[in-house]
Amino acid sequence: MKITVHSSKAVKPVYGDAVAAPSTADVVPLSVFDRANFDTYVSVIYAFRPPAPANSVLEAGLAKALAEYREWAGRLGVDGDGDRAILLNDAGARFVEATADVTLDSVVPLEPTPRVTSLHPSADDDGAEAEVMMVQVTRFACGSLAVGFTAHHMVSDGRATSNFFLAWSQATRGVAIHPVPVHDRASFFTPRDPPRVDYEHRGVEFKTCEKLDRNENNDDGHGHGHDGEVVVTHKVHFSREFISKLKALASAGGGQRSYSTLQCVVAHLWRCITMARGLEGSVATSVSIAVDGRARMSPPVLDGYTGNVVLWARPTATARELVTMPLQHAMGLINRAVARINDGYFKSFVDFANSGAVEEERLVASADAAEMVLSPNIEVDSWLRIPFYELDFGSGQPFLFTPSYLPVEGLLILLPSFSGDGSVDAYVPLFSHDMDTFKNCCYVLPELS
């Protein structure tokens, strides 16, 4: 597959004749949740069957959407105090037009390999001000269209980014944007008076600078570990029937608690990955699960909020405990850890992050985008509730959605299957020497104990 780039331009917001252009000197400080998130870019790819709107139509829709979501047309820089902030300078979002010399059917399914990185823009943040979002539209020989996004994670989480994608498609179709974007990053997360730090956040969301040394637990950025081990990604498809059987196992033996699809699938994957890695029994392993605070906080954060509202649950067990105990045990660990990240926990985090301790103790975010090998732990990004398949530029919904190639050993991404029947696709990156064992385990239901 050869991709030819024909143009690259900055698309700026178009406000219309009835709306006065706002100031381009405004600065939006990052919230405590933004600053605790990964300082990196995330790329995703949508694919649409023909007929697809012309590039000029997509560009015009993008300009209209950017007028409602100005942060995406801005830059990530610093404010007058030297703190990271979004600069609302209307510099524009990069819009790349490209063509492919093959039909889309000849390369689908798009496997999570380096080849897919040619379908979205690469970030260039070497300067003082970093681009926030980039888009690439690629036309295939058959008329199909791939739309690749690259967006900075410190600006928004998956839910907020998806809302912008929907806004772009709505603006392209000429319909009202919904949900209405909510840009206020200050008033939602004000600390309490007096503050109440009821939970420990050191060593959880924050770590000391001394712990930044990644020495041997790292990767060269190209899917190779410190001693040349190769990271490969396997896409696991869990059918609705398989997931139903996992849930049935949870209630076997008189268990009364019900578990979500996410909890069942993650528990199964956590056990399988631990077995595939061959960890010593006494080794502690944890799974980091992103928890959306929108509905958990009281009052709830509005669905149209444009920033990050995510913290992480981190259930932990020894490898021996995890693989010798029944699946219900892992599910219970996950269930209790996720339930713990409630309104009180989110507010405790806000109070701690604003207490001055982070600055006084020189703490930094534990979310480390440079950490490329997570073993003995895993991290899970669940996109199961994000409406990717509602994106419609006027010619129908996408028939394919995929994350880009991201060779971080142990970083799992869960997606709803495009079939819409309740099945789940999991992208699982592991060292190549662990993958055969993982494949032999992940499609087999655990035995009752």
Curated annotation (Swiss-Prot):
Q: Which residues form the active site?
A: H153, D392
EC number, as in UniProt: 2.3.1.-
Instruction: Enumerate the UniProt keywords alphabetically.
Output: Acyltransferase, Transferase
Tissue specificity, in the record's words, reads: Highly expressed in roots. Expressed at low levels in flowers.
Q: Name one GO molecular function term.
A: hydroxycinnamoyltransferase activity
What's the stated role of this polypeptide? Hydroxycinnamoyl transferase that catalyzes the transfer of an acyl from p-coumaryol-CoA to agmatine, to produce coumaroyl agmatine. Can use feruloyl-CoA, caffeoyl-CoA and sinapoyl-CoA as acyl donors. Seems to be able to transfer the acyl group from p-coumaroyl-CoA and feruloyl-CoA to the acyl acceptors putrescine and spermidine.
Q: What is this protein called?
A: Agmatine hydroxycinnamoyltransferase 1
Provide the gene name from the record.
AHT1
